[in-house]
Amino acid sequence: MTENSDKVPITMVGPEDVEFCSPPAYATVTVKPSGSPTRLLKVGAVVLISGAVLLLFGAIGAFYFWKGNDNHIYNVHYTMSINGRLQDASMEIDAANNLETFKMGSGAEEAIEVNDFQNGITGIRFAGGEKCYIKAQVKARIPEVSTGTKQSISELEGKIMPVKYEENSLIWVAVDQPVKDNSFLSSKILEFCGDLPIFWLKPMYPKEIPRERREVVRSSAPSTTRRPHSEPRGNAGPGRLSNRTRPSVQDDEEPFNPDNPYHQQEGESMTFDPRLDHEGICCIECRRSYTHCQKICEPLGGYYPWPYNYQGCRSACRVVMPCSWWVARILGMV
């Protein structure tokens, strides 16, 4: 009886007493191995899924960014034949920044012209040059490059465009002193010029030009409107005040050309600012593009009349489109 009274019935042992029956080491070994691999697998799965989602959104964003830039920037490459020598050139239209950039040549012969239509400033610089040149131009707003614009410009791709220099063409000569306060210049032009000193360009004509220009202005001053259709083309002087002819000092004696819409006076509502033609931005009477080169020269002291007032001329060339195309596509006015 004494031996039986010392025994504890199994039914008297509660659930809390089971913990004390198990060794501590055994409990530790069974808990840790079962939880650690599962947690690592979950973290790895979350990282992989997050990375895949980020890559997907990045690809979508890059696609739309590229697609958006394609509507704002368009490049075309062509070749110019200057005095029998071929040179590579390119034109870039950046509608987002309202810029038009022309490049000619490469290496030490490279010339770059940037037209800032937002602020009405043109910047020109040459490779290896010690100056950056600016001149005023018309202000405009470049629309997005549409499919029609691309098709029109793509006709220049791969073509060899001859360059014709006119002996009595306008010459741009830098002023003596650089610009001291450049706060009026946009960040685009300042970035384009970099650390180079900036000089204004002033137009100058060769020796025989001033007298002819004065005669042209006198002959065209009484009438600033377009010439009537019945009037012969050879009777009116090609002055700058005429809105139907190119500002040139040469005699305008072209025969009637039925293929030229300006000879037929089609589209009476389409008139152009002569400054567009005079500054080489577009050609009023042209139906096809051509290459326009302008001479950028350094001032030379001494006697004023030509050729003693400038030296060291270099050429900067660009494509000039017909004004009908330029106004419709670039200015977006038509």
From Swiss-Prot:
This is Leukocyte cell-derived chemotaxin 1. Signal peptide: none annotated. The gene is Cnmd. Residues 212-268 are annotated as: Disordered. GO terms for biological process: cartilage development; endothelial cell morphogenesis; negative regulation of angiogenesis; negative regulation of endothelial cell proliferation; negative regulation of vascular endothelial growth factor receptor signaling pathway. Residues 211-214 form a propeptide. Keywords: Chondrogenesis, Cleavage on pair of basic residues, Developmental protein, Differentiation, Disulfide bond, Extracellular matrix, Glycoprotein, Membrane, Secreted, Transmembrane, Transmembrane helix. Disulfide bonds join 132-193, 282-286, 283-323, 293-317, 297-313. GO terms for cellular component: endomembrane system; extracellular region; membrane.
